[in-house]
Amino acid sequence: MALINSICQNLIKPKNLKKILRSKRVKILDCRWYLEDEKKGFLQYRNKHIPNAIFFDIDKISNKESKLPHMFPKTDIFTQFINKSGINKNSEIIIYDQIGFFFFFFVWILFKYFGFKNVKILDGGFHIWKKKKYELESGLRAIKYSRSYTQISMPNLIIN
């Protein structure tokens, strides 16, 4: 129950994201992923996404040494993604998936595990953003590299 309350407290309404969309502190992560087609999320991102969104590729970042799919990444791989994406500890991270379904949860927990405090979930996901006819963009975006992230993990969040 505490986890559900925590997630609910970390939802952001599309209209509120729209207001802060251009803030330099805001980093938006497109986490769309589909079990039946691992490339579909990226293709959808490339076609249309929320302005300034960065694609979060779970297949690239996951721990490749695990026999199980999509396990938490090794620290160095996660740190590379964070730095490459221009994210730092002061960033306001907004994550979304296709419909606010389940994949956002994995990414939210991942960022919490690595010590990020300001992580929000777009309420309703990309589906609601698009339904409201809010601004979209297409293509890939250039990202400013940052070296400001120092890894802090919270292993007490993981049970083996």
Regions found by a protein language model. Give the residues of each.
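Cytosolic catalytic domains that perform sulfur/thiol-centered chemistry
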Residues: 1-160
